[in-house]
Amino acid sequence: MKAQVKTIEGGVAKDIELPAMFSEEYRPDLIRKAVLALQSTRRQPHGSYPYAGICSSAVGWGSGRGASHVPRLKNGSRAAKVPQAKGGREAHPPVTAKVLIKEINAKEKQKAFRSAVAASIRADLISSRGHRFEGTVPLIFEDKFENLAKTQEVISALTNIGVYSDIERSKESRKVRAGRGKLRGRRYKQRKSLLIVTSGPEFRAARNLAGVDVVTVDQLNVEHLAPGMQAGRLTVWTESAVIRLEGR
């Protein structure tokens, strides 16, 4: 499969042959499994104090008192320790021994990655995610794109190939999160827009654009390509990144 390499002015520089993984079968089931496995590694174990709710001298009265057989405090008839009592232990508290990480076979993980890469050049899947773009995919820039140092230069290059409208879509989608999360460092929700994949680590000019993620081809994973387990993210590649993708 061949693809056009675009200049930063929007013209066509040349044609290149895409790696074989761009022709991989679309497997949404494996993509979902791989993303869940990746997300599970970020979970932290939670547990409660082992003696929470039972640090009390309460004992049951036994039979013959006309009251239920629950532990009661010494200075009265108030129940303690049991889950249904105020200040009592939790019935089924979280335990640190719980296995949080989901496993995935190595070959399944590799196939999910290749499938997510292939989905990034399918216009129907990209449109179904709500992305806005003009022209055809894949979107591949010449390596000069990685040398851009100003955000305005990046905006100009993205406008020239007809994808800046997707960043505007993400910018308009920003809203205050419902619930307690707004008090816990995640006040705003915003839709994902472009994914920019480069060959080098020092491309910082696009990091402040709304919804944009910039990642090197070596650090690229399934979650970058399929946020929310839905494949078909609008992706901008550089020529060197596509070439280095062959070795993944």
Curated annotation (Swiss-Prot):
GO cellular component labels: ribonucleoprotein complex; ribosome
Xref: SUPFAM superfamilies: Ribosomal protein L4
Listed GO MF terms: rRNA binding; structural constituent of ribosome
Domain of life: Archaea
Keywords: Ribonucleoprotein, Ribosomal protein, RNA-binding, rRNA-binding
Disordered: annotated span: 69-92
GO biological process: translation
Position of the signal peptide: none
Pfam family, one: Ribosomal_L4
Protein function: One of the primary rRNA binding proteins, this protein initially binds near the 5'-end of the 23S rRNA. It is important during the early stages of 50S assembly. It makes multiple contacts with different domains of the 23S rRNA in the assembled 50S subunit and ribosome.
Subunit structure: Part of the 50S ribosomal subunit.
Family indicated by similarity: Belongs to the universal ribosomal protein uL4 family.
Protein's UniProt name: Large ribosomal subunit protein uL4
Provenance organism: Methanoregula boonei (strain DSM 21154 / JCM 14090 / 6A8)
